[in-house]
Amino acid sequence: LAHGTENDAKGVAAMIPGIEVAHISAAMRSLEARDRLRKANERVVEFQRKNPIAQLWGTGDKASADMMALDASQHLYNARVDPRRRTFAVGLYTHVLESYGVIYDQPIVHNERQSSAALEGVEQYNVRNEESMRLSLLAVDTHGYTYVGMTVAKLLGFDLCPQLRNMA
């Protein structure tokens, strides 16, 4: 709850009778351990591949990627001011399969072009999987594409498909 809301460990402990702040803090730290969420996301994707209903959501060869801004301290090295909220934030670039599994995420500097993060996520995923489970298409927004990025994507064997703004 503390990670998913704007409450801290003390606030969550106050909501649950019999739970101490130290227990909540320890649970939060265990979730923050290196690669813990990455491995959990991989297990979810594995489960989805075996589940017949998830196969109705898609074949798993397409994904989308976008950045989310997460509040951060101004003292964090890669924190920048989020232009929408006017607070310091760090970017989290996330790749999501068409079957809704999170296959890759990485922190990035806010307000930067995101095509390199988009390409890296697909390449990391494709390297870990066999040929039949690789991505063939990644949908991104305007910040996630450049001409160089589209060229590199083609050379790596997948399509980088931008949703371009103001096309009408």
Each predicted region: which residue ranges?
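Short, positively charged, Gly/Tyr-enriched micro-motifs
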Residues: L1-R43
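Short, surface-exposed connector motifs at secondary-structure boundaries
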Residues: D8, G101, N126-S136
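Short, conserved catalytic/metal-binding motifs centered on acidic residues
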Residues: V12, A63-M68, L138-H143
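Short, surface-exposed basic-aromatic patches at helix termini and helix-loop junctions that form
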Residues: I16-G18, E123-S132, V148-Q163
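A short acidic (Asp/Glu
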Residues: H23-S25, R36-L37, Q74-L76, T146-K154
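Active-site-proximal, Lys/Arg-enriched surface segment
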Residues: R34-L92
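Electropositive, glycine- and tryptophan-enriched low-complexity nucleic-acid-binding patches
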Residues: P83-N126
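Acidic, metal-coordinating catalytic cores used for nucleic-acid/nucleotide bond scission
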Residues: L137-V148, N166-A168
